[in-house]
Design a protein with these regions (language model features):
Chain A
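NTP/phosphate- and nucleic-acid-binding module
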Residues: 1-539
Length: 539, 539
C-alpha cells in the first residue's frame, strides 16, 4: 500500500475526512470533513490569517455562494471557465478530453484547443474506458454549477467558482468601510464549486472545496508593499528557467527587482506562503513555485504562480495560486453595471504664492512705465518684487498665499490575489505528519495545527478514577481544550490509538491521582511521560 | 426612522452586513457579512460551541452543500419542503400565497391547504400587487435550489435545506469514530439554502443563510441527558396554554416531568438556548419558546419548539428551532439504501453459577438415593449444596461459573435537534446592543462577542506618534487582537465613530506615550479613560 493510500485510510478511520455519501454508493468529488479534520481546518485557517490577514490590518468578509448569472458573465467566467469534454459516440460516456489524452501518453497543455484535442483523440484511436469504442466528439463544458434563483425561469444563478467575485462586487461598500484607503486587503474563507466532468484523485479534484482567498487592492503607481526579504531564497520555476525544468533559488526582493515578479505584493505573498506551508510541516525541499504561461493562466491574470507541494504518488500538486489580476475584475463589473469602481485619492498641493498688483498705486507711482508694468508678470527676486525690470515698493502689490489646494486623482486599483485550496493543504499537512515509529503509525501534526487537543484516560475502569478523569476533562474543556475521553482497553493500546490519530498529549489518571492530584502526561512524538498537576497544562 | 431601520443602516456603514449585489441592482434574499460582522459571527459560533458542543464532548463536522437528489428524496424534503405559490393569471407575477392572504387581513395557518388558499384568494378578490388583477392559481413550489452534478443530465442535486442531512448520511462512519457510543452529538456550522418565492424582511427571510445545528443521537429507552435545572424558569408557550396566548413559566425539569417536553435532551437544550441568547444580550423578557402544533411542524418532527426573540418592528421572530426528530431520518436513509443504521449495544450479563454433579461420586456415596439426587435440580443453601433435600459433600459436585455473557441489542437511535439561524442571531445581537447616549449612537455589544477588538489612535498626525502607534498595533495583532487603526480627524469624532461601530476599547497614543510609554484607554460604554501600559491589555 502506498503512503497516500495509508494516509487516506487513516483520514477516514480517525475522523479527518472521507468521501461523502458512501451509504448512497458515493458521489465523486465530494468529501466530508470529520471531527478531527474540522479542528485541523479551523487551525489552518487561523494560522493562515496570522500570515496573510492580521499583520497588515486586512479585513475578512463572508459573501453568498450563489451568484446571479450576470455577475459571472461580466467577470468572464461564463465564457472562460470551461473544460474540454470528450463524449464517446457509442456509449455516451463523458470524460475530460485532456485527461484521456495524457492517460494515453499523448502530450497536451492547457493551451491545446478543442479542435486539436478532437483530432488527437480520433486520429490516435484513444479507447473509451467504458466501452472501448474510439470515436469521440470534443466540446467545451461549463464547469460552474447552475441553478435558478426564485420562481421565475429566466433568473439563472451559479455557485461561485471562487470567493473573489463576492469581494469584487462589494468593492464600493468595502472601500467606504476602509475609509477610502488602499492598499486594502479583503480576505474570504469559504467554499468554491467546480462542476468537474469526471473527478478523480480523492481530495485533489473536488467539486465542492474550501478556499482561502485574499484580494489585495493597491495603487499600481505606488504599491506600498511591505519590505521584501533579501536573504531568504524561494524556488521559482519562472518563465525564463522553465525550459531547464529546475527552479531558480532567488530572494523575493531579487525576483521583484529583476522583473521576474511583476508586483512587489506578489513577491511579498510568495514569501509568506513559503513560510506558511513550512509551518504546516511541509519541508522546503518539497515546495516550489511554478509560473503559469500565457494560455495556461486564467483569463483574468497578467501573471500567475502556483505554489506546489510534492507528493510521492502524485508528483507536484498545486496548493495555492497567486494571480496578478490587475484591474481586470473591477473594470469588468464597472462596465457591466455602469458604476464607478475607483479609488479617489486627494492630494494636497504644496503652498503656492501669487503676486497681485495694486494697479491704482502702480499708476500713481510710475506715471510713465505703468502700462508695461501692468502688462507683464511680476517676478520675485531676492531683494524684492520686480515687474518689467522695475523694482516695486511694497504698497504696489499684494502677495496672496494659496495655502492648500486639493488635487483629485481617480484610479482603478490593481489586484494581487493569493488563493489557497484548504482541502489540499489539509491533505498535505496530514501526509507530511504521517510516519512510523517502532512499526506503529504516528501522525506528528505540528502543535500549531492541533495544540489544544488532549486525551484524558482513566488508567482502569474504576468509578473513582473515572469521576476524577471527568473532573479534569471538564476543567480542560472550560479552557477551550477539545478533550478526547477514552476509558476502554489496555493503556498501551489506547496510547497507540491516540498516536495514530495525532493527539499530541495524553493525560492518564491513576491511583496516585486519587491521592495527590497529579497525573501523567505523555507526549505523542517522544513517548516520554512525566507527572504534572492538570492545571500546569493551562499555563 | 424606526430602530430596526437605524440598525440596518448602521450595519451597512460600519461593516456588519448589507444586501449583496447592490451594484447589480440587488438580488433579494442574499446578504454579505462584512468585516465587523465576520468577527461577530465567529464569536457567536464560538460562544454557541461553549454552550452546545464542548461541555458534552460532542463532535463537529463539515459536509458538502450539494446533495444528490436521492438523499433529499429519502429524507422527505423533495415531497415536503414546499411553499404555496400564487401566480397572477394576468401578469404572471408570483407570490407566497399565505403572505398575500395575511397581508389582506385573511387568516391562514401553516396547515391551510393549497386548495383552500386558491379559493380564499379568488373569492376575496385579493389584488395582484403588480397589476391589480384578482385571478390566481395556487400551486406548490419546491423551495430547494436545484442543480446538476457533472455532465449527465439525469444527475440532479440540490443545495442542502439544512446541514442535518449531511450528518445523517454519515451516521455510520461517525458512530465508528465515536467508538459505537451514544449519546453522540454531532454539530455542524455552515450554510443552508431555501429558494424563497419572494423574500422580504431583510435578514429574516434569506435564500442563503448560516446555520448552527446539532444532531443528538440517543437511546430512547435511556436518554442519559445531563441533569435538568429545577430552579430556572423558561417561558414556554406550549400546546396546553396556546389558547391563552401567554407562556407558562416552568423549569426545564418540570416541563419534562409533566410531559410538556417529550425528551429530557429537549428540555436540556431549551435551558441552554435561553442562557445562550441571554449571553448575546437579549433580555429574558424578550425571549419565549413556542410549540409548533401538528400541521405547523416539519414532516420529520414529533415535537417542535421555536425559540423566539421580540423585535418592536416585526414582533416575535424565530431564531432557533428544536425538533424531536425521533428515528425518522435514520430509518428513511436505511430504507432507501438498504444499510443498517443502528447502534449495537453489547450488554454484559451478570456472572452466573451452575452446579454440575459428579455422578460417579454421587453413586458411590448415596447407594440408595443416588437416582433421586441425579434426577433433581441442585439447590444452593447457606450451608452448602442440597439435592433432593440431601446435603452433598464438596467432591460430589462442581460449581461452574459463566463469567461473562454478552447480550446484543440493536436499535435505531432517536434524535433531538437544536437548529439556530446565525444571521438572525447576529441581527438580534446588534439590535439589542444598539442604543443612544447623550444623543449619540452606541453599539454596546457584549464583551464575549467583540472582546478582542481594539482601536489604536495616534492623538495627532505626527510621525513619531504614528510610529509608536504602529508598534502597539503590531504587538496587539501578534496576540490575536483585531486592531482598527484610525489617525484622521478630531479625537472626539474618532471616539464617536468607534462607539457607533461597537469597538469596546480605544487606545490613544499621545505626547506622554513618547515619554513614558503609557497610553490612555477609553471604554465604549462608560466613556471612562485611564492611563495604562499597552502590555496591561494582554493580561
Amino acid at each position: 500500500m502506498d503512503k497516500l493510500t495509508e494516509v487516506l485510510n487513516l483520514a477516514k478511520s480517525k475522523g479527518y475526512f472521507w468521501p461523502s455519501y458512501e451509504i448512497y454508493g458515493g458521489v465523486s468529488g465530494f468529501y466530508t470533513i470529520g471531527p478531527m479534520g474540522s479542528l485541523v481546518l479551523k487551525n489552518i485557517e487561523d494560522l493562515w490569517k496570522s500570515y496573510f490577514v492580521r499583520p497588515n490590518g486586512f479585513l475578512e468578509i463572508d459573501s453568498p455562494d450563489i451568484m446571479p448569472a450576470r455577475v459571472l458573465k461580466a467577470s468572464g467566467h461564463v465564457d472562460n471557465f470551461k473544460d474540454p469534454m470528450a463524449e464517446c459516440a457509442k456509449c455516451g460516456s463523458k470524460y475530460r478530453a485532456d485527461h484521456l489524452l495524457s492517460d494515453s501518453g499523448i502530450q497536451v497543455s492547457e493551451s491545446t484547443s478543442i479542435n486539436q484535442m478532437n483530432e488527437l483523440l480520433n486520429q490516435n484511436k484513444v479507447k473509451c474506458p467504458n466501452c472501448g469504442a474510439t470515436t469521440w466528439t470534443v466540446k467545451q463544458f461549463l464547469n460552474m454549477f447552475e441553478t435558478n434563483i426564485g420562481p421565475y425561469a429566466d433568473n439563472k444563478g451559479y455557485l461561485r467558482p471562487e470567493t473573489a467575485q463576492g469581494i469584487f462586487v462589494e468593492f464600493k461598500t468595502l472601500l467606504d468601510i476602509n475609509r477610502g484607503k488602499v492598499p486594502m486587503g479583503i480576505a474570504q474563507i469559504g467554499r468554491g464549486y467546480r462542476n468537474e466532468i469526471s473527478p478523480r484523485q480523492s481530495m485533489i479534484r473536488l467539486r465542492e472545496f474550501h478556499m482561502m482567498e485574499l484580494e489585495l487592492f493597491m495603487d499600481p503607481e505606488d504599491e506600498k508593499a511591505p519590505a521584501l526579504d533579501r536573504d531568504m531564497k524561494l524556488p521559482l520555476l519562472h518563465e525564463k528557467v522553465m525550459e531547464k525544468g529546475e527552479p531558480e533559488l532567488i530572494s523575493p526582493y531579487g525576483a521583484y527587482k529583476n522583473g521576474i515578479l511583476k508586483s512587489a505584493w506578489l513577491a511579498y505573498f510568495l514569501e509568506k506562503s513559503f513560510k506558511f506551508v513550512m509551518a504546516l510541516g511541509v519541508p522546503e525541499s518539497k515546495q516550489r513555485f511554478i509560473e503559469k504561461l500565457v494560455g495556461e493562466r486564467a483569463h483574468y491574470s497578467a501573471q500567475t504562480f502556483d505554489h506546489e507541494v510534492f507528493f510521492d504518488e502524485m508528483g507536484w500538486t498545486e496548493v495555492a495560486g497567486f494571480a496578478y489580476r490587475t484591474d481586470y475584475d473591477l473594470k469588468s463589473h464597472a462596465k457591466e453595471t455602469g458604476q464607478e469602481l475607483v479609488v479617489i485619492e486627494k492630494k494636497t498641493i504644496s503652498t503656492r504664492k501669487t503676486i497681485k498688483l495694486n494697479e491704482k498705486e502702480v499708476k500713481n507711482t510710475h506715471k510713465k512705465d505703468w502700462e508695461s508694468i501692468i502688462s507683464s508678470v511680476p517676478e520675485s527676486r531676492e531683494d524684492g518684487i520686480y515687474c518689467a525690470g522695475i523694482k516695486l515698493s511694497s504698497n504696489e502689490y499684494k502677495i496672496i498665499e494659496e495655502v492648500e489646494k486639493e488635487e483629485v486623482r481617480k484610479f482603478v486599483p490593481y489586484v494581487v490575489e493569493p488563493s489557497f485550496g484548504l482541502d489540499r493543504l489539509l491533505l498535505a499537512t496530514i501526509y507530511y505528519a504521517y510516519g512510523k515509529k517502532d512499526g506503529r503509525n504516528i501522525l506528528s501534526l505540528p502543535d500549531v495545527i492541533l495544540g489544544k487537543v488532549v486525551a484524558v484516560l482513566p488508567l482502569v475502569s474504576k468509578k473513582d478514577m473515572i469521576e476524577k478523569a471527568f473532573e479534569i476533562k471538564a476543567m480542560l474543556e472550560k479552557s477551550g481544550y477539545f478533550v478526547i475521553f477514552d476509558e476502554k482497553g489496555y493503556i498501551g493500546k489506547r496510547y497507540a490509538r491516540l498516536d495514530e490519530a495525532g493527539i499530541p498529549k495524553a493525560i492518564t489518571v491513576d491511583g496516585q491521582t486519587l491521592e495527590d492530584g497529579t497525573v501523567t502526561i505523555r507526549d505523542r512524538d517522544t513517548w516520554n511521560q512525566k507527572r504534572i498537576r492538570p492545571s500546569d497544562l493551562l499555563v
